[in-house]
C-alpha cells in the first residue's frame, strides 16, 4: 500500500470493485465486534484481528507467538499476523454485497452525476434505485424504448404481452446494467455535435453532460463503478471502541451503520439461497441500499438513522464535513504541547517586548529545559532526579528557571485571531500569582481588555522557531497595522488623558511668564511650586542644542509650558520640539511664532496669545508614526514605553475624577424642545389638511427632532469648561465621545423600533434628569438589538474571512518587476459630498506608471516607476493634481501573484514589499478583521417610500465578494449618450428612461419609486447607473471591461 504518512495532496475519486478488494485484508462477514466476556475481537467481525492485525504489538490472538522476533509470521492456530498493532489504523476490510448498490454521492449529489451520464432525471433514478419502477435495459424487438420506466403493473402486463423478448430490471442492478451499456466516446461525440446547434437550457445541460463524460474518459474510471458490489470497511482503530469506567463501552457511530449493512446483507444472502419470493427479496435489497446510503452519508436521503436518544448517527461523510471533521479538527488544527492558557492582567511596568509569566506556568512550560540545565550544572545526577527536584520545588530550580527563560521568546495568542497581530512574541518575565501580564499597548492589536479575557501561550522549541519568533514576531516590530500602515500601538485611555493633561495650557496660573535656563531649572521650579504643569513659561532655545531649531531661533526664548517640556523630553533628542498639536509642525519644525526676542516683554506677549490646545490621542498616533518613519523599530518601542509610563504617571497625578456635578445642565434646553414641539404641530396640521402625505410628515418629524438634538449638542459644546473632566476625557480621545455626552446632559433623542424603523417619539430626558417609564421602555429596544446583532455578526464575519483567505492565499509577491505597461488612473473616492478616501491615502506607497508633473511649474514630482512617499504625495496634493496613474495589482502581469512594483509599500513596515510576502492573506485579513465592527443591518432609509433598502455593512461586503445579484440593484446604461426622456407610467408602476446613443437608443423600465441619479439631457457613459442602488458586477463586466468592474468593486468595499 501507499505510505499513508507522506502525501502532498488528496483527491476524491471512484474506486473500482477490484480496487476495493485489493485494499482489503479480508471480508467482514459478521456484525459482531468484541466478545462481551473476554473483550477480544470476534472472528469475522468488525474488529477481527485476522483481517485488521493484532491488538497488541507483536502478539498473535491466541498468544502462541509473542515478541518482535516472530515479526511477519502468520500464526497457524489463529491466523493472525505478528506485527505492530499500528497496522489496525491502516488495514481495511470489505463487505461483499449480495446485490449491487448505488453510491449516494453520485446519485444524490448536485448535479446528479448518474443522471448526467445516463441522461435521466434524478426523480426517475430514485424510482428505479428504491424499487418503485422497472426500467427497460434492452427493448429487443418490442416497441418499448430503452430507459423507459414501467410500474409494477405495467411490467407484468408487458411480460404477459412480450414474454422474454425484452429485458427490464429494477434496483441497483438496473442502474449498473444501464451504466455498463454507456459508450463514453460515442456519447461525447454526439454531445459535441449537439452543442453546435443547441441553445438555452438544452445547451447548458449538454455542456454539463459533456463535462462529466469527458472527466470519465480522462480519468479512465468506468461509470458503472458508481454502483458498488463490495464496500470497504474502515480500519478499526479509526472507529475504536473505548472502555469507560463501569465496564460500559463508547463506540463510534460507524459501528452501528456497518452492523446494519452486514445484517441486511447476510439476511439477503440467506433469502437468495432459500429462493424466497421476489417481493421479499426486493424489500431486503431496498433495505440494504438504504443501509449503505446511511453508512456513506446519513440523512442525505429520507430520515437519518438515529441512535440512542434520537440523535442522528454520524456517517463517513460527516467525518469529513465542517469544523469538527477530520480535516479541520485533526489534520489542519492539532493541539500542541508546550502551551498553556490563563487569564490576563495588565502589566504597566513591562517593556514593549515583555510579558509577565506566572511562575507555576513557567515551571511547567519550560520543564525539559530546566531539567537539562539542572543536569548540565551538576545540580541533579540524572533526568529522573531533576524531575523530582522540580516536583519538590527546590530552591535551586528557581535560579535555573530565571536563566532558562532569558532570551527565550514565547508566543501569545488571543482568540479570535482575526489578523496576523493576533499572535505575537514576547520575552517572558517571571511574576507572582496565576495570571499572565500583558503590556498595555499590546491590547489594541489583540483587541484584549482585562475584564476576564484569557490568552494562550506557546513555547517555540527549536532554535529555528526561536529565531523566527525573535526576528519576525516580537511585539516591538508590530508597530504599524498591516491593513493601513497606521500605528496599532497607540496609547489609549489613561495614557492619553495623562499626556493630554500634561500638555494643557492654563492662563494666569502660578509663575506665568517666568524665564528659565534649561529643563533642570524648570523641574526644580515645579518641585518647589514656583510654576505649575500648565503654566506658560519661557526657556532659552540654546539649552536644547540637539533640537532642529533655526540659527535665529537658537538666539531666542521659546514660549512653552512645563508639561510640554516634560513631554518633549521623552521624544528622541533630535526630534522636532512639539509645542502645538498640528501635523505640519511634525514635519517642518517649530514655527517662529513660539519664539521671543531676548528683550521683549513676555507678559505682554502672553496676554495677546491664545491658549494652545493639548495633545490628543490622534496627534500622539501621528507622533509615533513619524518617529517610526525616522528612527525605525528600536527607538519607537523605547518611545512607546516612555510615553506609556509618562501617561500613567501623569494621569495619576492629575487626580481626574468624575462626579455628578460635572454633568452640567443646559438652561436653553426647554426652549429648544418647545420650539421643536411647535414645528411638529405645524407639520401634523399640514398632514391633516391633506397638504402632505403620511410619509412626508414622518420624514419631517424625524428631521425636526434630529435638528433639535444637534442644536442641544452644539450648545453643550459651546458652554463647556475645557477643565471639565468629562469633556477632557472625550476631547482627548481617552474614552467616550460627544454623543455620550449629549445623552448625559442634553437629550437622548430618537430611538429605533425593533423593526429598525425610527420611532417618532423622541426621548426628551437625559440620564442626569432620569428617564420616564415609557422612555426607558422605548430605549431598551435598541439595546437588545445591539446585543443580538453583535453575536450574529461575529460568526458571519469570521466565515467571510475564512472564505477570503481561502481564495487569496496563493497571491504572493513573486518577482521584482513584471514589466507591465498598464496602470490605473486613481482619483479620490467620494460619495456625494462625503469624502471616503482622499487621493493622498490612495497614492501613498504606490509606484507611478507615468511621471507625475506639476502642471504649473512643469517640475517632475515623481519619476516613472518610482514610489510615492509621504513628501511627494503631499506635493502632488499641493500642486492641485486630481488624478495619478499608478501601478496596480489589477494590471500586474505576474503569474500566480503580484510583483513588488505593482503592489507597492508593505504597510506593516513602511518599506518596499519583499519577494515572498504573502500579500493575499494580509489583504484577506485586512478586510475580514474590521468585518466584526461593521453592522449587520440592511440600512433602512427613514421610510421614504420606494427607496429600496440598499444593503450596507457586512452583508454588502459579502454581496460584493461573492458577486451575488445585489438587493435593490441599480439599472445601468449600455450605451454612451444623452438621457432623452424619463416618463412615468402610473398604471404599470414604472418609469421609462430612454438613453439615445450615437448609433442606437435604449429604453429601460425602472420601478416608479426608484430614486434617479440622472436627469433629462444628461450625458452619460456606458455602465453609468441610472438610479440609486448597487450595480450588479456581472452586468457591468458585459457593458464595460474587467478593469472598470474591479475598480467599482474596490470603491464599494472601501465605503
Curated annotation (Swiss-Prot):
InterPro entries cross-referenced by the UniProt entry: DNA-dir_RpoC_beta_prime (IPR045867), DNA-dir_RpoC_beta_prime_bact (IPR012754), RNA_pol_asu (IPR000722), RNA_pol_N (IPR006592), RNA_pol_Rpb1_1 (IPR007080), RNA_pol_Rpb1_3 (IPR007066), RNA_pol_Rpb1_3_sf (IPR042102), RNA_pol_Rpb1_4 (IPR007083)
Protein residues bound to Zn(2+) 2: 818, 892, 899, 902
UniProt: Zn(2+) 1 binding residues: 60, 62, 75, 78
GO MF terms, alphabetically ordered: DNA binding; DNA-directed RNA polymerase activity; metal ion binding
Binding annotation for Mg(2+): 449, 451, 453
Domain of life according to the entry: Bacteria
First and last residue of the signal peptide: none
Catalyzed reactions: RNA(n) + a ribonucleoside 5'-triphosphate = RNA(n+1) + diphosphate
Gene3D superfamilies: 1.10.132.30, 1.10.1790.20, 1.10.40.90, 2.40.40.20, 2.40.50.100, RNA polymerase II, clamp domain, RNA polymerase Rpb1, domain 3
Top-level EC class as recorded in UniProt: transferase
Swiss-Prot/TrEMBL cofactor(s): Mg(2+); Zn(2+)
CDD domains reported in the protein's UniProt record: RNAP_beta'_N
SMART domains in UniProt: RPOLA_N (SM00663)
Keyword vocabulary terms for this entry: DNA-directed RNA polymerase, Magnesium, Metal-binding, Nucleotidyltransferase, Transcription, Transferase, Zinc
SUPFAM superfamilies in the cross-refs: beta and beta-prime subunits of DNA dependent RNA-polymerase
Biological-process GO terms, alphabetical: DNA-templated transcription
Cellular-component GO terms for this entry: DNA-directed RNA polymerase complex
Pfam families for this protein: RNA_pol_Rpb1_1 (PF04997), RNA_pol_Rpb1_2 (PF00623), RNA_pol_Rpb1_3 (PF04983), RNA_pol_Rpb1_4 (PF05000), RNA_pol_Rpb1_5 (PF04998)
Assembly: The RNAP catalytic core consists of 2 alpha, 1 beta, 1 beta' and 1 omega subunit. When a sigma factor is associated with the core the holoenzyme is formed, which can initiate transcription.
HAMAP family reported for this sequence: RNApol_bact_RpoC
Biological role stated in the UniProt entry: DNA-dependent RNA polymerase catalyzes the transcription of DNA into RNA using the four ribonucleoside triphosphates as substrates.
NCBIfam families, per the entry: rpoC_TIGR
Homology family: Belongs to the RNA polymerase beta' chain family.
Protein name listed in UniProt: DNA-directed RNA polymerase subunit beta'
